Amino acid sequence: MPESPSTTAVAAELHVIADQADRLRERVGSLAEPFLGTDREDLVSAIHEAERQLRMAERSLQRALKTAR
């Protein structure tokens, strides 16, 4: 029978990944700033949608982290 992985190790990995998702969300969000108020609202909208998706991913990872602890 295979050994089950340590929840401590899983929690640590989830913490690192959630932190990375947060930093990526911030980076992605800042990409829209130069285009605010220009005729590139299509680009701003797409960037903001990507930022929202990263926020949702981070929240899901945080929930998984709480479950693993």
For each feature predicted by the language model, list its residue ranges:
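N-terminal acidic leader/helix
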Residues: 1-31
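Short, charge-rich amphipathic interface segments used for partner binding and complex assembly
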Residues: 30-67
